[in-house]
Each structure stands twice: as C-alpha cells, then as structure tokens.
Amino acid sequence: MTVDTDKQTLGFQTEVKQLLQLMIHSLYSNKEIFLRELVSNAADAADKLRFEALVKPELLEGSGELRIRVDYDKDARTVTIDDNGIGMSREDAVSHLGTIAKSGTADFLKHLSGDQKKDANLIGQFGVGFYSAFIVADQVDVYSRRAGLPAREGVHWSSRGEGEFEVASVDKPERGTRIVLHLKDGEDTFADGWTLRGILKKYSDHIGLPIEMRKEHYGEAADKPAEPEWEAVNRASALWTRPKSEIKDEEYQEFYKHIAHDAGNPLAWSHNKVEGKLEYTSLLFVPGRAPFDLYHRDSAKGLKLYVQRVFIMDQAEQFLPLYLRFIKGVVDSSDLSLNVSREILQSGPVVDSMKSALTKRSLDMLEKLAKDKPDDYATFWRNFGQALKEGPAEDYANREKIAGLMRFSSTHDTTGAQSVGLADYVSRLAEGQDKLYYLTGESYAQIKDSPHLEVFRKKGIEVLLLTDRIDEWLMSYLTEFDGKSFVDVARGDLDLGKLDSEEDKKAQEEVAKSKEGLASRIKAALGEDVAEVRVSHRLTDSPAILAIGQGDLGLQMRQLLEASGQAVPESKPVFEFNPTHPLIEKLDAEQDMDRFCDLSQVLFDQAALAAGDSLKDPAGYVKRLNKLLLELSV
C-alpha cells in the first residue's frame, strides 16, 4: 500500500460527536461487543458483494472465496478485522463513517436510558455499530477499496474519536475493508488469540462465511511457516441450512441477535423446511422488545431473503403482512430466480403462496408461545399487541386466528391488565348469553366504573374493557368470534336478549310508556344537543348516561380522525335516564321550567364527563351546578 495522498481533515456530524463521547466514556460494561459489531458489518459487506456480483461477476475480481479475518499484534497493541467484501470508495467512507444518513444517531441518543448494559444493546439496532470500535481503541484506521474500482482508488480513513477524522487516497490492491484498532491503555487483553477466539465463538459462530484467525505456533521458531496459516474459528455454515436437532438454543439466540441487531434474546422462534411443490426454508423469530420505530411508516421491516443460500436483500416485506412487521428472520427459496427484484416480488403465485404459509407459521408460533409460556406472551403483547390489532382489517382469512391471540382488560380481572383472551371470555359466558360485550374508553381507570356497566354487574356478566386508541377501529372489522357477535354496550338501544326475562322486557316497556312525557320535556330542554331521549335499561345506580347512536362514531374514532386532520361527521348522543333514580324523580316533579332546564343540562354534562368526553361549555356547567348547590343549602 502506498503513502496517503490527497489528504483531508473533516469534522464529524454533531450527533456522531455525541455518540463518540458515549462510546469512549460510558459504554464500558460490555466492551467485547465491538468485535460482534465489526464482524457483523463485515458479513453484511460480503452479502452485498455476492448480491451485486450476480449482475456484475467481474466485481469478484477472480476471487469468489469470501471470508473475514481477525488478527492481532501484541507488541503493537492492535486488533485487525479484514474482509474481502464490497468495500468502500472515498465518498462511501466519508458519508458512512462521518455521518449517519438516516438520523440513526439522533434516535439512538434519544433512546438512551443511562443503564450501560441496555444502552450497549441499542448500538446495533440503530445502525451505529462501527463506532463501538472506540470503546476499546483510541485510534481507528480503516483501509478500504470498493469492488470494481482500480487499486489506486483505495481510501484510508483515520480518527482518534475526537470530533474530526482524516481521509486520504491510497493504493489498495485487494478489494474490501481492513479496520485496525489501536487499543487504549488497559485494553491489551483483546490483543490475545484465545480472548478473540472466545468472543467470536460466543457471538459469531452462526455467521455464514469463514471467520479466520492465524494458527497459533507453539513449536521452535525455525519450524514456524514463512507465511501465516489461517483457520476458520466458526462453523461457517448458514444456520438455517442445518438440521434443527443439531442446533442449540444458544445458537438460535445468537443468530437472532445478528440479523435483528438486538442484544436481547428472542421470545420464540420457528425453523421449518418446506419440500414439495414449493421448496424453501424459513427461520422466524419473535423479538423480546419492540424497536423504537415500530409504528413509523418507513421503519425497517421484512425478512432477509436468500435464494439458494445467496443473499438477495434485506427487508423483503412481501413475505409477511404489515401487522406482523415485528417478526424477524430469514427465508431461503429454491423457487425464486437469483436476479429477483423488489418489483418481481410484488406479486405472483410463488410469493403469494410463501406469504400465506409464513403468515400461518408466525401465528402458530404466537399461539404456541401463548399456550406454553403465558408470561413471555404477556411481554409480547405489551410490546406488539397494537400492531397485531391491525390484523383483522388487513387479513380477513386469518381474522379468527388473530382474534384468538388478542388480550384485553375486562371486568373479570380487577388489576386492569390486558390478560383476557377471547377464548377465556367465551368459556365464562353466562347462561343464555349469545353476545360478546365490550366497552371502549381512554383508560381502564376511566371506564372500569362506567355507568354503562351497571346492568352487567347486576346480572354478573363479564364485559371486555378496550382502552387502546385503535380499539374502536379494530371492532369495526372484528365483528364476531366463535360464531358470536360483539356488542358495544355504549351503542344503540341495548338488547340483552335471553338475559332479560319476558317479564323484565314487559316491565321495561311499561316504564318507558309511563315516562314518555318526561322524555319529551328533557328533549325540549336539551334541544339540539341530543338526538333522542329515552328510558335506560342499562342503569341501576346512576341517573343518566349518553349512548352512542347505532351508526355514529364513538369518542375514540372521533379523536383519531381529528388527530389526523380529517373531517369528523357530526353526531349527537342519545340521552338515557334511570326512571327510579331520586334525581330523575325530582326532575320529573319539577314544575319551574328554568330549574328543570338547569337540572337537565347538569345531568347531561355529568353523563358526558362519565363517558370521557369534554364539555362544550364547562363554565356554564359550573355556574348551573353552583346555582343548584346554593338552592340546596338554603
């Protein structure tokens, strides 16, 4: 390699400076991750070269044997990671090593918790793994040449992690990237063959290409070979191609960490080989925690796609529906061509068939997790439940299966935890109950004592309590389960069917008829604020509630539409009153029209508050309430 030419000194992006400070001063509790990250990057570089060489075989430059080499020099106190992958041009080195184009650094810094171990785990997830080199090194030199460029267009990038880096042109005959870490004082333990082999075995045994180290020579100096001999220190076979019976749980876990850039273990995995009309192998994982960008429109999602063990692309989104975007893994097909593109993957019988099978496989994996490890499934639900709730709208064919995986709060569990599955709910149905009842609201605390639940408590009927913002939208698609319809207890004229006896229904009709005059007076007092006034069959303790019209939007959907800037159709609630409540009896007896109107409006406003709605005229409510309280105190 020749002397550096055309040397420049450039400054790091502001966020990268912050990141470097973090690496240098804070993340020292798990230093060995630097090797995991740099080897993982080298493996990605090899994958990219394989893919580009499908179209341009000349990029292999006569050498298709891809490998990663890890070496060390005790005297010089250096560790070197060398690959013959795709390599970098000068422009690549400046843009990839001096800035983070996708704002990954800013997001990384935003998610730091101050817990060293947790923060170290975030490094790979946010695509900033290269900078982990500065955990153990006070200077990092990178020598690289992109495949296809002439030897004279190599690049030397160098930095001490202090806000600036140098970049220069060098001659580099061989393609790929060599990273030289100059170890800090006190980090000499990493300039040791056994230490490095141990770390590679721990983190990188699953990497699908050879990771080589120099053979240790323990004999006489005269017997030492003139050229160093290299030996693979990992299995160097794609994990998913091996028989399941030969793979340990720890190997699956390390492979997941490699492909997901996550230092935590997965909650579950499913490894399957399909033979017959279609031939492919899949290895799918359920992560233990949600990525920071799970709900971002442009977040990374999809599986790693291989064709006959040749890497084709990351984030192949076409093999799983959007509601399963949290699933990580690989799919290796024998039925797709090596020159497959994202456009080709958009449709076609092979892709459609694989998507259908992989979707079912993912849902089966979640069912097994829920059955065998309910505590782990509770963790999954906390992290990914809202994404799964998108399923019934997107995947009609699997709607029942998805519904069975959902968990909700209910009146059966007073902790408020989302722990109740629909199958459990159905198993507890009251005698004669043929409907599944639910109530939506902003929070468990807000709806657990809702007046809408009073008649259900009286009859001992369980009601699901749905408090995620997406729930009302979800229930517009999830209309039944196990052959039974869902009923919103706050919507329309509640009909309990067989849960009410014929005598009960007859008595309700008689009461409603006897209170028609009161209903008309209240409607006149409330005017355009309500669509209708009627006697309630829902209430046992409260004086009044607001019911949602059968075809109207509920509060959650109105808020969702407003938040997204969409027009919200106008709707008016139905005012229902409890004819046996003392306040309603007092209202019925009130002859003073002003007092009647004030009391009616106060009852309406209280019902709105109980439903979680805001008041149009809070000052008017307070004024009327104070007036009534003052009259009572006289």
Swiss-Prot record:
SMART domains: HATPase_c
Gene Ontology cellular-component terms listed: cytoplasm
Region feature B, mapped onto this chain: 343-559
Subcellular locations according to the entry: Cytoplasm
Top-level taxon: Bacteria
UniProt-listed InterPro entries: HATPase_C_sf, Heat_shock_protein_90_CS, HSP90_C, Hsp90_fam, Hsp90_N, Ribosomal_Su5_D2-typ_SF
Region (C): 560-634
GO molecular function term, any single one: ATP hydrolysis activity
Keywords: ATP-binding, Chaperone, Cytoplasm, Nucleotide-binding, Stress response
Pfam families linked to this entry: HATPase_c_3, HSP90
Chief location bin: cytoplasm
Assembly, per entry: Homodimer.
PANTHER family recorded: HEAT SHOCK PROTEIN 90 FAMILY MEMBER
Family membership: Belongs to the heat shock protein 90 family.
Protein name: Chaperone protein HtpG
